[in-house]
Amino acid sequence: MKRSIAFVLFFAVLFSCNEEQQKPETMLVPSANETADMNKAWNQEEQELIHQFIARKGWDMIETESGLNYLVYKNGTGAQAEPGMKAMVDYSISLLDGTELYTTQSSGPRPFQIDKDNVEQGLHEGITYLRVGDRAKMIIPYYLAHGLMGDHEKIPPLASLVFDIRLLGLSD
């Protein structure tokens, strides 16, 4: 018994002496220019993925200056949406790979105040291109959606979103 304990202790001491002390890792913080360059590269890569997605779908979308893409595929005849109005919408939200994340199909239409409520920035912009009764596809890049963090529920970090949306009504 003493022999086995001595044997185990000998190897424990032997192997512990050979281990190098690990130095704490130094965390390098990127400069403002490096951060801007990383964001620019991410944005360009994301726009490329979005353009490839649009080409695969064969959609003739309009791209806005901000990077939002939209296509009205069914025209309504109602009033034009404007900032400050309350919009009532039906929608489904999915990722570029087709994974459906959210839909109003089970919860019912969703109201939000344009340019006021806490919804995706791209939705605030995109809804202003619609009239009551319009059905549209919108591709909202991650930087106009939930950004670097996602929504901590279903939307992952850096995720561009595909909205299939119908503007049901507007009120002041």
Report residues per predicted region.
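Cross-family detector of peptidyl-prolyl cis-trans isomerase
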Residues: 5, 17-172
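Sec-dependent bacterial lipoprotein signal peptides
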Residues: 1-15
